[in-house]
């Protein structure tokens, strides 16, 4: 009887593979790749918080937060890292607000960046689907979900009610996109805004537009918020920003990366490297003084950052020590409970 069941199962598996291709069904432990393939986020602190050294390929990422918190900056740094590694990047600018000069300062090669400024939400998501399905694009950024306006809303009058249109649009699009994103190993970053529910007395009244679909389909959700202003004398030169990993399917969630987002420069590599080096006792902090190998590098954090920026060899040495201390760049195994979500490969 057992042999009959095994023969029937083998016949069914052969039929499935014949109809849908090799690798369409297999035993979970048979050929699965248990390593997460990632690309760096452009921030060492965020790479550590993500737990796998960057953004996992073939997954959906949501980046949300208040206005001017640094959401687009986070996405542009990811694009710059993809291009540094020889990849192709696309930016769906639904807000029609991308600043090419700022993107260039962050390291983005604007001559090679694919840019689309769609008229409707359907058009933007169809373009994203076409790019992902091609298999030739490594990262697609949609800025932002809130600006993906359904065609019916654009064609209608200003005061017309369109209940749930955007949520249905996102739900349908993500059903189509999720499979091809996984298959082509494309990283899809959706930037989102926040709104507030009216009449909420208890709990957090903040919600993200576009319905619940993106929350479910996203492997990682990042909440970006300004913590404090950074000043040089009386001039405000940037913001101290907290990036919280609210959801993470490939590593433990709820870790926080604190970075300096400098105006016109993006995330300060020196600032986060200095903080992480102090945390691991690679750089010594005594009072206001920072020292490396018994040599003082600056009094106060800003002076120490300036010293590191003018001494690239020392910065590279500290960076290597910090990466080794945090295990960045090493292969990371996926937790057993999330292995089932991996794409099947031939």
Swiss-Prot record:
One cellular component term from this protein's GO annotations in UniProt: cytosol
Keyword DNA-binding set for record: yes
Pfam families noted in UniProt: RecA, RecA_C
InterPro entries, A to Z: AAA+_ATPase (IPR003593), DNA_recomb/repair_RecA (IPR013765), DNA_recomb/repair_RecA_CS (IPR020584), P-loop_NTPase (IPR027417), RecA-like_C (IPR049261), RecA-like_N (IPR049428), RecA_ATP-bd (IPR020588), RecA_C_sf (IPR023400)
Listed Gene3D superfamilies: P-loop containing nucleotide triphosphate hydrolases (3.40.50.300)
Cellular localisation: Cytoplasm
GO MF: ATP binding; ATP hydrolysis activity; ATP-dependent DNA damage sensor activity; damaged DNA binding; single-stranded DNA binding
Residues annotated as binding ATP: 65-72
GO terms under biological process: DNA recombination; DNA repair; SOS response
Record flagged with keyword Endoplasmic reticulum: no
Lineage: superkingdom: Bacteria
Keywords, in A-Z order: ATP-binding, Cytoplasm, DNA damage, DNA recombination, DNA repair, DNA-binding, Nucleotide-binding, SOS response
PANTHER family in the cross-refs: MITOCHONDRIAL DNA REPAIR PROTEIN RECA HOMOLOG-RELATED, RECA
Record's function text: Can catalyze the hydrolysis of ATP in the presence of single-stranded DNA, the ATP-dependent uptake of single-stranded DNA by duplex DNA, and the ATP-dependent hybridization of homologous single-stranded DNAs. It interacts with LexA causing its activation and leading to its autocatalytic cleavage.
Family statement: Belongs to the RecA family.
Designated name of the protein: Protein RecA
Organism: Enterococcus hirae (strain ATCC 9790 / DSM 20160 / JCM 8729 / LMG 6399 / NBRC 3181 / NCIMB 6459 / NCDO 1258 / NCTC 12367 / WDCM 00089 / R)
Gene of this entry: recA
